[in-house]
Amino acid sequence: MDELLKILGANALESRANIARMLNVPAAEVDARIAAYEKLGVIRGYQAILDEDKLDLDTVTAVIEVKVTPQREGGFNTIADRISKFPEVRSAYLMSGAYDLLLFVEGKNLRQVATFVSEKLSPLDGVLSTSTHFMLKTYKRFGVLMHQETSDERLSVAP
């Protein structure tokens, strides 16, 4: 992977001047390369990683496994594209294993997520079954630890 992309992946807020120094190139070249990556769709956006516990958000996140029937003309893409368009769906992935799709879904409460599954997702043609898991606590998101240990206590090791 390009070193510029590694730097941006670690900290998208890094100044162009610092990036230019790290790469030993002019800042104008950094700007041009970033613009080119954005135009090509390599860089799809920039996002802050939020600690939702500290924000005290009233939202519920669910991980939903979905078993689907692949479409004759589009395979898994047709149904995955359709499901991805629902505003409740934050992320969608094609997976190997017992289920075909893995969804991350957000709602205001358990009932809203349940309504999404029962009234929008499950009735879709091609959806065979779902398995919903509610997230209780986040320890790490996108490579960032959400809860830093504050003491110097060591964890006990069982024999």
Language-model-detected regions and their locations in the chain:
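A compositional/biophysical signature of low hydrophobicity enriched in polar/charged and small residues
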Residues: 1-159
